[in-house]
Amino acid sequence: MGVQHKLDIFLVSEGIAIKEANLLKGDSYGCTIKIKLDKEKTFKFVIVLEPEWIDEIKPIYMKVNDESVELELDYKDAIKRIYSAEVVLCSDSVINLFSDVDVSYTCEYPTIKVNTIKKYYSVQNRGMTYVHIESPINTKDKCWFVEKNGWYEDRTHS
């Protein structure tokens, strides 16, 4: 079977969990998220990476409309890394979360569509993954966060 890291992306502001956004084989992970909106909105992302091994993990990069966004490392232990980012979007946007930016990998990552106007989301292209979407975010996944002022905040350090 080979190496396989697990990547889940939580679009907390929309109550959407993008599960298993990792390639079926190898240590690459990521996805493209296409967001449609009609007004300015703040989006909170929480990215949970569960690596098969911890010696060396590829960093994950986030780009919003081709502009780099820094991810905060909120939590790190032997079996899990949790990153977060908050972005303000004013128009339809494309978000890329990738560990590898080479086209031989990016063409295999899934594409997710999120329409905030119609409250609709779908997997446009699965790529070489078992990606699926859950909404609302389930209680087990929420255990990594605690709701505070409408956002989920990391509580793993307490």
Curated annotation (Swiss-Prot):
One GO term of the biological process aspect: viral process
Keyword RNA-binding: no
Annotated keywords: Early protein
Family of the protein in this entry: Belongs to the poxviridae C7 protein family.
Its job: Plays a role for multiplication of the virus in different cell types.
Protein name: Probable host range protein 2-1
Species in which this protein is naturally found: Myxoma virus (strain Lausanne)
